[in-house]
Structures are given as C-alpha cells and as structure tokens.
C-alpha cells in the first residue's frame, strides 16, 4: 500500500516543506551536520501531528481486541507477513501469492484492509488470514501495527500491496537474522533484531530502474531515506511498532524510515545485500519523493 493512497491524500498543503527552509544557510549546515535532516523533519512531525496519536492508538487497540477473536486456532507459524491494503484489487493478489510461494512453508499471511470496503478474490490457502478495520484510518502505521499485534509467530515481515517478493526472500532474511552480529573485534556479539534485504526497483512498464542496496549505517540514515519495510524481517517484540503519526501526501519522512530508524537505536539491524523484493516505483512512491528533495 503506497503511503499516499488514503481518503485524504490531497489534504496536506505543505508538500516537501523543510524545517530549515526559512533558516540561513550556515545554520542549516550546522543542524544537518549535528542532527541530520531526517530527524529534524520527524521532530517537526511530532510537534505538529503528535496530538492525533492517542486517538488512533485507542482505535488500534480496540481493533486488535475485536479481530483477535476472529483468527483461526492452530499452532503458531515461524513467521507472519503483514500486508496492509486499501482499495488495491489489481495488485493485492500478486503480492499475497508471492508470500505464499516462499520456499519456506511455516508461515502465515495477515492482510489488513484499512476500511476499504472489501477485498478482491485471493488465493485459497489456509495460511492466509484477512481482516478489515471498522473504518478507514489513513494511517499506514496503525494498519501495520494491527497485523503485528495479531501475529503470534517468532518473526514478522512486511510487504505492501503493490510489491512482490522473490521466492527465497524469507529464507534469505531468516538465515541472516538467526546469525549473530559480531562485535568490532569479530567476537560473538548481540543477537540481531532485524535484517533488511535489497530492493529491485521496477518501473510501471516493467523495466528495472536499479537495485537499492545500502549497508545499515545509522549516521548515514540521518540524511538518506534508504530504510524500507518491504525488505525488513524482524523478531516480533513489543518494541516493534510503526509510527502512528498521520502522514498525508507530502509529509516526510514516511513511516518506514521513522520506525526503523527509531527501532535501530536499541536493536541491532543488518543489511543483507541480496535483491529479494520487487518494488514498484511510480511518481507517488516513497523513494521517488525522497529522490526529488533538494538537500
């Protein structure tokens, strides 16, 4: 689900407004050097939109309680994939099928409909669960959080409804995730909390644009928006929750960067340089927006 496909996608009048736009160049350079632009954008978002979070958090929690009672009984899978969706019938079935076609079988797919009024016909597979929110939230983070909180697996993964995975995506990510992150001396270090694979970015006409493969560097992430949930696989934990801020079109950074950057502060993350995600690029996608911003 692209971040802009909500009922209020044109509501934001502040497309690409930089928090340093009205500051002098020397001050902007100092702020960027010490903090990075993306944390400053996110601080602005929290100040402007933080008052909306309590309401959507209450709705999220109520929906989790309501929907949990509808889930099928059975043993917990190894990994749950959360697919948020909103009125995307033309691409959702292919996204779901790409998860069901993974080389590992011990999985579950939870499709969370953001009050879109119904879902298209999807593959008949007992590993697929679909739920619908009581009404449209237009907050991608809330939709993903409902899926995370409904999961009972050891690991969770994420895929948008217009993207697809290669068959070995989960196997590749889980193999890396189950390894240990070595410390600076090459000794056994902390257990990895999450990994993200490379994205093969594809244009609407099917041509490959490029492969986005950036090793994790928290300092670099302060100024470059390379963190994306579609390649991210993590150990399920209470700490892993997506941002609940409402982000209409033009509000930056997006949920993926805000969530993974914050999560990486206390949880080791590593990049797996294998392109296992087929990521559709169009004029409204996350990366197209970021690539157009003047730094």
Put a short name on every predicted segment.
Residues 96-137:
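Acidic donor-binding segment of Leloir-type glycosyltransferases
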Residues 156:
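Short aromatic/hydrophobic "clamp" motif used to bind/position activated sugar donors
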Residues 170-209:
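Conserved donor NDP-sugar-binding/catalytic core segment of glycosyltransferases
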Residues 134-151:
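Glycine-rich, basic loop-to-helix element that forms the pyrophosphate-binding segment
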Residues 91, 144, 165-172, 205-207:
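Acidic donor-diphosphate engagement hotspot in glycosyltransferases and nucleotidyltransferases
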Residues 160-164:
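The conserved acidic donor/metal-binding loop of glycosyltransferases
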Residues 14-15, 19-98:
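N-proximal low-complexity "stem/linker" segments adjacent to membrane-targeting elements
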Residues 216-295:
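Conserved nucleotide-sugar donor-binding catalytic segment
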């Amino acid at each position: 689900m692209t971040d802009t496909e909500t009922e209020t996608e044109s509501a934001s009048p502040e497309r690409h407004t930089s928090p340093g736009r009205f500051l002098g160049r020397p001050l902007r350079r100092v702020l960027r050097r010490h903090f990075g632009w993306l944390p400053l954008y996110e601080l602005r978002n929290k100040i402007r939109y933080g008052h909306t979070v309590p309401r959507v958090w209450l709705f999220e929690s109520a929906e989790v309680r309501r929907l949990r009672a509808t889930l099928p009984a059975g043993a917990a899978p190894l990994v749950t994939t959360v697919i948020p969706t909103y009125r995307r019938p033309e691409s959702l079935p292919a996204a779901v099928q790409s998860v069901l076609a993974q080389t590992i079988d011990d999985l579950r797919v939870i499709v969370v409909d953001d009050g879109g009024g119904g879902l298209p016909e999807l593959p008949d597979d007992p590993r697929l669960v679909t739920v619908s929110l009581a009404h449209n939230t237009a907050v991608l983070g809330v939709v993903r959080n409902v899926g995370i909180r409904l999961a009972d697996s050891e690991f969770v993964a994420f895929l948008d409804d217009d993207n697809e995975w290669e068959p070995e995506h989960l196997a590749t990510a889980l193999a890396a995730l189950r390894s240990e992150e070595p410390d600076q001396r090459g000794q056994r270090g902390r257990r990895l909390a999450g990994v993200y694979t490379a994205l093969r970015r594809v244009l609407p006409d099917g041509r490959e644009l490029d492969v986005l493969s950036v090793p994790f560097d928290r300092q670099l992430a302060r100024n470059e928006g390379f963190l994306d949930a579609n390649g991210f696989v993590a150990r399920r934990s209470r700490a892993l929750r997506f941002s609940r801020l409402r982000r209409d079109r033009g509000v930056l950074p997006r949920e993926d960067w805000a969530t993974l950057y914050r999560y990486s502060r206390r949880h080791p993350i590593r990049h797996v340089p294998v392109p296992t995600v087929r990521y559709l690029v169009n004029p409204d996608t996350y990366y197209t927006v970021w690539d157009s911003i003047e730094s």
